[in-house]
Amino acid sequence: MSKVKSITRESWILSTFPEWGSWLNEEIEQEQVAPGTFAMWWLGCTGIWLKSEGGANVCVDFWCGTGKQSHGNPFMKQGHQMQRMAGVKKLQPNLRTTPFVLDPFAIRQIDAVLATHDHNDHIDVNVAAAVMQNCADDVPFIGPKTCVDLWIGWGVPKERCIVVKPGDVVKVKDIEIHALDAFDRTALITLPADQKAAGVLPDGMDDRAVNYLFKTPGGTLYHSGDSHYSNYYAKHGNEHQIDVALGSYGENPRGITDKMTSADILRMGEALNAKVVIPFHHDIWSNFQADPQEIRVLWEMKKDRLKYGFKPFIWQVGGKFTWPLDKDNFEYHYPRGFDDCFTIEPDLPFKSFL
């Protein structure tokens, strides 16, 4: 049979998806984290893989889903949090713009799965299934109550789940995970479609969302989930030593406040007394597309006058950041290769060919 007749949509998908195959899985497994450091990889959106010098592997908010895929229904889901926020009716054109850089079903070495909150782009049934099927049978699933309710509903045994709220501490090998207050006001209006938010005092944030501080022997990482800007970042900065902070950044559409702005990211870094602040989430949704260089430009304008003690870092999805080795870098670039050029004799017609 000819190739053009044997190839199907399904064979095409299986041969090209996930786009990075197991490349990043292999890179993470092979990484030997040096003493006095920690390594992390950006998985897209707010997904992070963190690896410590003791070999602890944890993933946070690893999501393997997609956004809008069809114009079929021109209207937003009734009761959606964005509809509540802005009184809109039209479909939100949020298409996923980031490739899938990690294969959940190729994960073998993992010590904990974490989620900051239960929004669809921060917790994933495919990740849960892959870990349950292919990894050790004692890997815990850690998150606030709403996340644990989801995991249990998907079939994760209750005894594998750990509910955390601000103030709780969980130890995973040599990583101490501190659950802290979250400031995700969008989470408070994520309600059942038939439930009204107008005129009703929101229920507590603690069951819905948490921020995390990961204390490793090589440094600390602050993961803010989908939190908006809050004065309480300064409280967290007073109470904890924070090396690297991650903040959800994006260009909010008209009538919407769901992501931190460039100014908010700088305020967050300053309030937390962080050494490095890294924006994320701006990569994933087409309608929240934002240029992180804006953060760096604003930082350059303010850093001397306000005596900033932190630097911004512009990352790329799938890229690695190692603390403290990368603390003075401003931007990530994927490995360029060809470092072994001229280790063998080139095969060219003549030397001046190129």
Curated annotation (Swiss-Prot):
It holds the Pfam family Lactamase_B_2. GO terms for molecular function: L-ascorbate 6-phosphate lactonase activity; manganese ion binding. It is an enzyme of class 3 (hydrolase). It is found in: Cytoplasm. Disulfide bonds: none annotated. Coiled coil: none annotated. It catalyses: L-ascorbate 6-phosphate + H2O = 3-dehydro-L-gulonate 6-phosphate. Its cofactor is a divalent metal cation. InterPro entries: L-ascorbate_6P_UlaG, Metallo-B-lactamas, RibonucZ/Hydroxyglut_hydro, UlaG-like_MBL-fold, UPF0173_UPF0282_UlaG_hydrolase. Keywords: Cytoplasm, Hydrolase. GO terms for cellular component: cytoplasm. Its main location: cytoplasm. Its EC number is 3.1.1.-. Pathway: Cofactor degradation; L-ascorbate degradation; D-xylulose 5-phosphate from L-ascorbate: step 1/4. GO terms for biological process: L-ascorbic acid catabolic process. Induction: Induced by L-ascorbate. Repressed by UlaR. SUPFAM superfamilies: Metallo-hydrolase/oxidoreductase. Belongs to the UlaG family. NCBIfam families: PRK11709.1 (NF008688). Probably catalyzes the hydrolysis of L-ascorbate-6-P into 3-keto-L-gulonate-6-P. Is essential for L-ascorbate utilization under anaerobic conditions. This is Probable L-ascorbate-6-phosphate lactonase UlaG. The gene is ulaG.
